[in-house]
Amino acid sequence: MSDRVIRIATRKSALAMWQAEYVQAKLLEAHPQLKVELVPMSTQGDRILDTPLAKIGGKGLFIKELEVAMSEGRADIAVHSMKDVPVDFPAGFGLHCICERENPYDAFVSNTYASIEELPQGAIVGTSSLRRQCQIRSARPDLTIRDLRGNVNTRLAKLDDGQYDAIILAAAGLIRLEMQDRIKTYIEPTVSLPAVGQGAVGIECRNDDAELIELLKPLNHSDTESRVKAERAMNAKLNGGCQVPIGSYAVLNGDELYLRGLVGSPDGSVLLQAEKRGNVNDALSIGVDVAEQLLEKGAGDILQALYKD
């Protein structure tokens, strides 16, 4: 155990590398005798930059290659942004650690305007997320929403070039890259409910590697795990992928878990919402309950229409 080398599969983007280096540092902090190496690689989601994510389709656009590296023995663990992680894992693999969550809110970024409310009619807002698009369109149907792909720096450069009046990014990514000064406003969940698992980092590895799973335990953050578990249970019941207009956000207050869920039509004309409070030990059933409420309101029809496209 003392001289084991752990190889971390990671995407090459600055944010993905930050996450992998964070896990590397935490592992060495917990187990100073370990050797931890990074194995950077490109994924399908990184390579296809000229198409909106929702149109590429499929689940796991940003993680499949990392899983192949583990299955071929080139890596031992994969570090993921939890909002990119599908509900189901390949046979033999599982999520064995969720690290402490960063701010899970969406961030409003603009060089001219202070908030969504301040944007003038017809202003151009950049985001590729159907979840963000449907909620912004619902709040401000007079705005023009345009797709925005690329890593954080690329997106900010497009804003600075004047292609957009504002862009919406995950606050966590900007904070981790020490770019929080670009954030004009943190968008409240009542305006834009975050994505499932947004702001949390998860670690995937083989289910049969008992020694490695034990080594990961000190990195797990139980509060974050409970919250993300509820959000993912809702998503699983809805059979949602990463690129669908689904929002889910759990808050923990003592032993009480409060989960809000949302499914919207991409044009923002329909926003279905549901919520549930319960004991944190019932995180999974709370997630399922919120999903069932949404399905009763017609969420299945919205999602089915999207999957047909």
From Swiss-Prot:
Needed cofactors: dipyrromethane
Residues the record lists as S-(dipyrrolylmethanemethyl)cysteine modifications: C242
Cofactor binding note: Binds 1 dipyrromethane group covalently.
Enzyme Commission no: 2.5.1.61
Alphabetic keyword roster: Porphyrin biosynthesis, Transferase
Recorded GO MF terms: hydroxymethylbilane synthase activity
Catalysed conversion reaction: 4 porphobilinogen + H2O = hydroxymethylbilane + 4 NH4(+)
Keyword Ligase part of the UniProt annotation: no
Function: Tetrapolymerization of the monopyrrole PBG into the hydroxymethylbilane pre-uroporphyrinogen in several discrete steps.
Family the entry assigns: Belongs to the HMBS family.
Protein name: Porphobilinogen deaminase
Source organism: Pseudoalteromonas atlantica (strain T6c / ATCC BAA-1087)
